[in-house]
């Protein structure tokens, strides 16, 4: 009976000790779980930092590759535009030189035509004057009844000579004017063709640069 009482007395203390041990075990498990979670979070943060570093390194490497390429493309485009401008200026100077040469040739030809036509016209006028004098002399030598016919012949001859002179002058002026219009239109057509070709080249360069820039920004 005394042993049973001792056991009954010790049983609450054992129960309390058991509870304390269970609480200690739970605390230990909680601490282990907390440490495990902390280690997991630390590893996750380290992995995230490593991934961020890798992304930054890759971004820097991509920038290091693309930036020189973009600068080179821009420099090439600027060089192409400068060359196109230089070609336009050279072509314009050549066209101006050709136009000046054509103007000089036209002036020389006009002078040569004048030099040729003026003596011819003077000779024709002199011949007309000589013909008129001869006709007057012939009329004076004709009898009185033939004077009217002589006057008609003289008037017809004078009209023929005047019409021929005017026709020659008109034909010469028309020839010079037609040649000048043809030369001018040919020079203007050549200049317009060169200007359009240079403009198309500049537009192609600009379109190429606009196509390349979005690709570069997408890489960055």
Swiss-Prot record:
Region annotation (Disordered) ranges: 1-81
InterPro entries from the UniProt entry: IQ_motif_EF-hand-BS, IQCF
The organism's place on the tree of life at top rank: Eukaryota
Tagged with keyword Acetylation: no
Residue ranges with Basic and acidic residues bias: 1-22
Coiled coil stretches, renumbered: 69-93
Residue spans of biased composition, Acidic residues class: 23-50
One Pfam family here: IQ
All residue ranges annotated as the IQ domain in the record: 146-175
Keywords of this entry: Coiled coil
PROSITE patterns: IQ (PS50096)
PANTHER family named among the record's database cross-references: IQ MOTIF CONTAINING F, IQ MOTIF CONTAINING F4
Entry protein name: IQ domain-containing protein F3
Lineage: Eukaryota, Metazoa, Chordata, Craniata, Vertebrata
């Amino acid at each position: 009976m005394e042993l049973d009482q001792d056991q009954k007395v010790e049983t609450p203390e054992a129960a309390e000790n058991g509870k304390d041990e269970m609480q200690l075990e739970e605390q230990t498990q909680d601490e282990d779980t907390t440490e495990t979670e902390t280690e997991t979070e630390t590893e996750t943060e380290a992995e995230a930092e490593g991934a961020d570093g890798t992304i930054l390194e890759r971004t820097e490497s991509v920038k290091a590759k693309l930036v020189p390429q973009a600068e080179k493309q821009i420099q090439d485009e600027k060089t192409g535009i400068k060359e196109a401008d230089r070609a336009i200026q050279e072509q314009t100077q050549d066209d101006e030189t050709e136009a000046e040469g054509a103007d000089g040739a036209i002036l020389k030809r006009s002078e040569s035509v004048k030099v040729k036509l003026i003596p011819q016209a003077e000779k024709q006028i002199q011949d007309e004057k000589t013909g008129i004098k001869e006709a007057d002399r012939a009329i004076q030598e004709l009898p009185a009844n033939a004077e009217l016919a002589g006057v008609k012949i003289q008037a017809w001859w004078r009209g023929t000579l005047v019409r021929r002179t005017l026709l020659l002058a008109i034909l010469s002026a028309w020839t010079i004017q037609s040649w000048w219009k043809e030369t001018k239109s040919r020079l203007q057509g050549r200049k317009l063709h060169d200007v359009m070709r240079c403009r198309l080249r500049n537009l192609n360069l600009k379109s190429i640069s606009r196509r390349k820039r979005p690709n570069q920004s997408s890489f960055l």
